[in-house]
């Protein structure tokens, strides 16, 4: 319980001072996915994830505790990319700050989001 409270406190602290995360292009993300060298976090919500789908290999973000379980065996130097709906959406920060609070050092943002992914002609995976 203490670990959970500490994790929540860190996430809140990071949220308060969180700046922008470096952007990653659709091309670079696609290369990282094909190489198996990235964790992709979808922050669009269960309804969107179920109806529309997610970027291939993406894990669905619901909360920091669930993300901690999903990424428990992942090396901390792994590239982590969070995304949401598109350029004007900032929900991705929930997933990015949670990953950062878990100790991941290479956290990026796909600012194009799922809408940019689709606009680029890329396919989604069903959840």
Where are these regions (language model features)?
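Structural scaffold elements adjacent to functional motifs in cytosolic proteins
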Residues: 40-42
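Glycine-rich, flexible N-terminal cofactor/catalytic loop recognition
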Residues: 32
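Hydrophobic h-region of N-terminal signal peptides that target proteins for export
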Residues: 9-17
């Amino acid at each position: 319980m203490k670990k959970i409270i500490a994790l929540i406190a860190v996430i809140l602290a990071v949220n308060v001072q969180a700046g922008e995360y470096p952007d990653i292009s659709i091309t670079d993300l696609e290369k990282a996915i094909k190489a198996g060298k990235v964790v992709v976090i979808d922050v669009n919500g269960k309804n969107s994830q179920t109806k529309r789908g997610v970027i291939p290999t993406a894990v669905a973000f619901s909360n920091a505790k669930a993300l901690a379980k999903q990424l428990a065996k992942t090396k901390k130097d792994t590239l982590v990319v969070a995304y949401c709906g598109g350029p004007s959406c900032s929900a991705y920060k929930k997933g990015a700050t949670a990953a950062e609070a878990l100790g991941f050092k290479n956290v990026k943002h796909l600012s194009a989001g799922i809408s940019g992914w689709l606009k680029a002609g890329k396919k989604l995976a069903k959840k």
